Amino acid sequence: MYDFQGALKDIKNKGLYREFRNVNAAQGPYTVIDGRKMLMMSSNNYLGLCDDIRLKRAAIESIRKFGVGAGGSRLTCGNFELHRELEERLAKFKDVESCIVFGSGYAANIGAISGIADKNWVIFCDRLNHASIVDGIRLSGAKLVVYKHCDMEDLESKIVRYHTGKSLIVTDGVFSMDGDVAPVDRIVKLAKKYNLMTMVDDAHATGILGEKGRGTSEYFGLKDAVDISMGTLSKAFGVEGGFVAGKRKLVDFLRHKAKSFIYSTAPPPHNMAAALEALNIIETEPQARKELAEKSVWLRNRLIEKGFNVPKGVTPIIPLMVGDVNTAVEFSMLLYNEGIYIPAIRPPTVPKGTSRLRISIMASHSYEDMEFALKNLVRFGRKLGIIP
């Protein structure tokens, strides 16, 4: 029998053991964790919609009409009108022909990749892509070729070496733990040069990047350039779910081939209703997106000025690099004791030796909130010798 206890002991000895914190209130700039009021500085609730009254009303009205569950998969009895409406709206929002909604972003990635590719494919994958992308490739049986993070020279050399008739380049649009934006324009150029398909995971870009919040394609001014565009409803949208958007024939194919779609109970109607309301807000209230960008730049620049190892960037994900696992955990705990919630991110989520605090900004954070966080980050950063 497998030695679970021994494996857990090894995890603890490496400083990698995780314990759950219990959230006792809605997520906003402040929440309640284990009974304590905390400044939330690590949520993916970028536009502050998780607790928006309009989304809650939409969900409640849907529950009154449709109940709390879908009752079956989309291909049996669980296909509600709200699913169709959201898919049509998302396709229009992403400026593509069609869209398919999954229960989560993870399900969208593994379903799309394993549904499209098989052992005859070669898939080129950025080294820092999300785990769901890597799992989807492994599930498909395709040959996995990893290229250096955002390194187009390395990608091209590997395309020349490994490219076959059926090949795909897949990348995060915004990398979830680093906050940097993939050079999607250059990836598309390489794909056209060598006749490959492209897939972009825009989980952390949808609703955030681009003039209308459509994601990395809009950010780079690309039209009909990315073959497969994935997004989530659980970040800027503040709800739950994932989707894949693209050509009508692609989406129709995935309805018949994506196992995580076929064999899962459909997302509950109230999630779709809340997501539709979130989309209304994203399309009609660009000010929140503008404020998010301004606040993200403000805090990032202040941290750099104070001497922290923080890369430049344009997204609300701000990685404060620490390196050592135990130091990152201690830093996080010192902040927690002061009422600031920023968990330490450790391997295997990030590569060994790159443990960090993943700070993320919400449009609903005030500058006073960020000043309070900054003051304590500097205070404890100096105490731990992270900054002079």
UniProtKB/Swiss-Prot annotation:
Keyword check for RNA-binding: no
Record GO biological process: biotin biosynthetic process
Cross-referenced InterPro entries: Aminotrans_II_pyridoxalP_BS (IPR001917), Aminotransferase_I/II_large (IPR004839), AON_synthase_class-II (IPR050087), AONS_Archaea/Proteobacteria (IPR004723), PyrdxlP-dep_Trfase (IPR015424), PyrdxlP-dep_Trfase_major (IPR015421), PyrdxlP-dep_Trfase_small (IPR015422)
Chain positions with N6-(pyridoxal phosphate)lysine modification: K235
Cofactor(s) this protein requires: pyridoxal 5'-phosphate
Residue sites binding substrate per the record: R18, H130, T349
Catalytic activity: 6-carboxyhexanoyl-[ACP] + L-alanine + H(+) = (8S)-8-amino-7-oxononanoate + holo-[ACP] + CO2
Highest taxon of the lineage: Bacteria
TM regions (residue ranges): none
Listed GO MF terms: 8-amino-7-oxononanoate synthase activity; pyridoxal phosphate binding
PANTHER family recorded: CLASS II AMINOTRANSFERASE/8-AMINO-7-OXONONANOATE SYNTHASE, LD36009P
Functional description taken from the UniProt entry: Catalyzes the decarboxylative condensation of pimeloyl-[acyl-carrier protein] and L-alanine to produce 8-amino-7-oxononanoate (AON), [acyl-carrier protein], and carbon dioxide.
Record-stated family: Belongs to the class-II pyridoxal-phosphate-dependent aminotransferase family. BioF subfamily.
Protein name: Putative 8-amino-7-oxononanoate synthase
